[in-house]
Amino acid sequence: MKPAFEDMNLQIPAVTAEPEDYTGEDGLLYCGKCRTPKEAYFPADKATLFGRDRHPAECDCQRAQRMEREAAEQQRKHRDKVEELKRRGFTDPAMREWTFANDNGRNPQMKTARFYVEHWEDMKAGNIGYLLWGSVGTGKSYLAGCIANALMEQEISVKMTNFAAVLNDLAASFEGRNEYISKLCRYPLLILDDFGMERGTEYGLEQVYNVIDSRYRSEKPLIVTTNLSLDELNNPPDTAHKRIYDRVTEMCTPVCCSGVNFRREKAQEKMERLKKLMND
C-alpha cells in the first residue's frame, strides 16, 4: 500500500511550461508574458507531506483569464435567469419592451416608477404598492412594465397580468383555484393591469375579490393600473365592488397618470406615415 503522501503527490498537477516561460532566480517557473510566477513553494511541513517542494500557482495572465471566464459564466446565468423570469412573469411578449431604456421621456410619472425600483427593498418591507390611475392611453401599463422589467433584471420575480387572463386561467386550471391564487401570491410583486375592465358577473367579481384579498393577506406589494377615476373607486356602485375597491385603495398609493394620449398620438403618427407612403 502506498503512503498517503504519495497519493497526495499524484493529485497535484504539474505546471505546463510554455516556450516563452523561464526559471527565475528563486528557482520557480515564471510566465514569459506577465513575468509573474506560475509556481509557489510549499512551507517546509507541507513539502514533507506532499513529497515535493512546490505547487502550481496562477500567474497574472491565468488569473485574468479565469476571472474573465467566471464573469462570462455569471453573465450567462444572469441572462438565463432573467429570460426565465420574463417568460413566466409576462402574459404578453410586448411587455418585454416596456423599459426605462425605451422610454421617450415624456411621461412625467416615470420618475415615480424609477423611485419604486430604486427603493424596492423599502417598498417590499412596507408592503407598498401603486395604483396607477388615469384615462386611456396615458402610459399606465408602460409605467408598470418598466417597474417589472427593471426588477426582473435584478433577478426579482414579478408577475404582470390582468384579470381577463386570470379568470381564463382559473377556468382552465387543473390545479384548483386555491393553488392558482397561492402561486400568484408567492410572487414578490404582483401587477394587475387594466383593473376594472374584467367581466362584471357575480362569478367574475368573486374571483377578483379572492385574488385581491389573498394578495392583501400575503402582505406583499401590489401594483394596479386602471382607467377608473379615484372618484369611481371611492364611490363603488354596489357592495361587491366596494369590498374590492376598498382593498385596492388600502394596499396601493394612488399615482395619477394624465396628459398626452400616447396611443392616439401613435395612431396619428402611423396615419401620417401611411399618407406619406401613398403620396410618394
Task: Give the residues covered by each predicted segment.
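Walker A/P-loop nucleotide-binding motif
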Residues: 124-144
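A short, basic N-terminal segment
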Residues: 1-104, 265-280
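Pre-Walker A (pre-P-loop) alpha-helix and adjacent loop at the N terminus of AAA/AAA+ ATPase modules
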Residues: 91, 96-130
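Short glycine-rich substrate-engagement loop in P-loop NTPases that contacts/grips substrate
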Residues: 108-117, 148-189, 199-206
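Residue-level preference for the first positions of well-ordered beta-strands
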Residues: 127-131, 158, 189, 221
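Active-site donor-binding loop signature of nucleotide-sugar glycosyltransferases
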Residues: 61, 105, 163, 257-259
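Walker B catalytic acidic pair
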Residues: 194-195
